[in-house]
Amino acid sequence: KVDTMHHYREWFNYCENSVLNAKFLELPFEGEDISMIIALPNEKEGLASLENQIEKVFAPQNFTNEFLNVALPKFKVESTLELKSTLKNLGVEKAFNETEADLSGIAGDKGDLVISDALQKTYIDVEEGGVEAAAATYVVVEATMSAPFPPKFEPEPKEFIADHPFIFYIKAKDFIIFAGRVSELSH
């Protein structure tokens, strides 16, 4: 669930994808090669259509630096994912077995340590000052390139108003490390 919108009027990496009938906005994390991408369907009820084409949503987009009027909701996502069964299905079984586990490289002898569980906790908080991810990295949204026009001249901005459900994902270089959706907005 999300609440209050906050507004930006500045330069962003932006893309309009007619095949997906959606707009894409890139919010770079300061000082890192990581960014959050927001995929906003052009239609207010277009989230299901985007989800049905998720591979295309996650594919690289043809971003250009555009002057935008952006309105984003504040939202917070917290999740805990149990990985033990997934890891076992992938063949990582011995580390969970008391008689076969060999974690002697960490401490003690073979059999002294065993993995009892594996969890992944994720925390994303989008607020007016920026994005906090995994409760460890604080970022501020800012333009990534200098404006191609003199500072006194501002072209008419394009609109990116996230007032309906959308998909977001965080990528490091070309790898998606987290994805989610905002499906309910309160105004």
Go through the PLM ranges and name each one.
Residues K1-H187:
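Secretory/exported precursors with cleavable N-terminal leaders
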